[in-house]
Amino acid sequence: MKVRCFCVVLLVSGTLCLHADRSYPGNSVPVTLNVQSR
């Protein structure tokens, strides 16, 4: 069970990182910070 949850977390974090890279090229900063600043 723990392994499955860990895999899910990795997949979610990976997709979030991809979306962040596409939205903000050259910025590896979390999207939440950018959204809150606006």
Curated annotation (Swiss-Prot):
It is a single-pass membrane protein. The keyword Cell inner membrane applies. Induction: Expressed under many growth conditions, up-regulated in macrophages. Keywords: Cell inner membrane, Cell membrane, Membrane, Toxin-antitoxin system, Transmembrane. Disruption phenotype: No changes in biofilm formation, persister cell formation or bacteriophage resistance; no visible phenotype for a double timR-timP deletion. A timR deletion leads to mild envelope stress. The keyword Membrane applies. GO terms for cellular component: plasma membrane. It is found in: Cell inner membrane. The chain crosses the membrane at residues 1-20. It comes from the Bacteria. Its main location: membrane. Belongs to the TimP toxin family. Toxic component of a probable type I toxin-antitoxin (TA) system. Neutralized by sRNA antitoxin TimR which binds to the 5' UTR of timP mRNA and inhibits translation. When TimP is expressed from its promoter in the absence of antitoxin leads to mild cell stress; overexpression in situ is toxic to the cell and causes membrane leakage. The antitoxin gene is encoded immediately upstream and transcribed divergently from the toxin gene; antitoxin RNA is less stable than timP mRNA. This is Toxic protein TimP. The lineage of its organism: Bacteria, Pseudomonadati, Pseudomonadota, Gammaproteobacteria, Enterobacterales. The gene is timP.
